[in-house]
Amino acid sequence: MARIEARELDLTEKVVSVNRVAKVVKGGRRFSFAALVVVGDGKGHVGAGLGKASEVPEAIRKGIEDAKKNLIKVPMVGTTIPHEIIGHFGAGKVLLKPAAPGTGVIAGGPVRAVLEAAGIRDILTKSLGSANPNNAVYATIEGLKGLKRAEEVARLRGKTVAELIG
């Protein structure tokens, strides 16, 4: 799969979570920050990244950089997804279900950020397993990676779409 060039897309950034983490050393605690960032163009491209630094703005900048390196293309049918799928990452599981036009994005915080960045307007989701924002975001991305259009599946199986649905 060819890498998606972030420079050619008009990306919007959304900070999903900023976490203060501590390293315990002899003299006490050393604090640093981890920022989870989602980027997307609202037209089917989305990526997520984690940035770590001693200052929040620097962690966010690194997260954006990382997210731009991990862009994926989401196959869409109108304003929703082609079929139901469960994305897994660590202990996080996210169920993604296509929805009728006008339904809107029915999703929790971290999952919603990914779907809105991707440009999906109508979808039903349920976060199963881990409620950790990192796992929820990456499980959503894994689910979106696993989506295939009916035409693509038919081509892979050497059949027509009518035979596949039929």
Swiss-Prot record:
Keyword Ribosomal protein part of the UniProt annotation: yes
SUPFAM superfamilies: dsRNA-binding domain-like, Ribosomal protein S5 domain 2-like
Keyword Membrane in record: no
Gene3D superfamilies attached to this UniProt entry: 3.30.160.20, 3.30.230.10
Superkingdom, taxonomy of origin: Bacteria
Domain S5 DRBM, first and last residues per copy: 11-74
Molecular functions per Gene Ontology: rRNA binding; structural constituent of ribosome
Alphabetized UniProt keyword annotations: Ribonucleoprotein, Ribosomal protein, RNA-binding, rRNA-binding
GO CC terms of this entry: small ribosomal subunit
Gene Ontology process terms (BP): translation
Written domain comment of the UniProt record: The N-terminal domain interacts with the head of the 30S subunit; the C-terminal domain interacts with the body and contacts protein S4. The interaction surface between S4 and S5 is involved in control of translational fidelity.
Role played: With S4 and S12 plays an important role in translational accuracy. Located at the back of the 30S subunit body where it stabilizes the conformation of the head with respect to the body.
Family according to the record: Belongs to the universal ribosomal protein uS5 family.
Known partners and oligomeric status: Part of the 30S ribosomal subunit. Contacts proteins S4 and S8.
Protein name: Small ribosomal subunit protein uS5
Gene from which the chain derives: rpsE
